[in-house]
Amino acid sequence: MSSDATERPAQRESAAHVRTLVERAQKGDRAALEELYLIHFDRIYGYLHMTVGNRHDAEDLTTQTFLKMLESIGRFRWQSAPFSAWLFRIAHNLSMDHFRSHRRWQPEAEVPEPYDSDEPSAEAEAMQSIGRQSMLELIDTLSHEQQQVLTLKFVFNFANADVAKILDKSEGAIKSLQHRALASLQRQVEEPPS
């Protein structure tokens, strides 16, 4: 891979390197904690921004996510989920706590860009063809769970098994939510309300 300075840290880091960083962080290595923060910050912030709908809350929840990571990293175990799925699970839990305490969603009129934007994604092409505001309106018709699944799958490129762990659901439930969400979006695009 290139060492281009504009390349995102998460794209440069291998699973083996992240594993080494986690092991070092578990032994109290501050530099390893800082590097884990830098590698994952953009993706965690982007996920929370898309989840809670505004920058201020996303910033607060991102800070809380990394504080929880700092408090809990000693208990992290490499079982069936990668470190990033564990970290996203912390972010997801905090966002659910946020929704329970605020009981409302306050979206901004912007959609964050996908993170692997070397090639236009299906999401980007759809946004260009129907417009950002129209896409927001379409996505807003989906259930919160469907929105979460699509975000984790198509914006953050998690596998179904990892999405299931993050959202604490079965892999079958994730596939079903994804299928229903995509079918709903397809129906809405093909048959817009008159």
Regions flagged by a language model, labelled:
Residues 1-12, 24, 128-129, 134-137, ...:
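C-terminal edge and immediately downstream basic/flexible tail or linker adjoining helix-turn-helix-like DNA-binding
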Residues 1-43, 50, 132, 140:
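N-terminal module of bacterial RNA polymerase sigma factors
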Residues 26-27, 53, 64-81, 101-103:
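Sigma70-family region 2
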Residues 71-78, 89-109, 128:
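Arg/Lys-rich amphipathic alpha helix in sigma70-family domain 2
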Residues 96, 146, 155, 161, ...:
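DNA-recognition helix of helix-turn-helix
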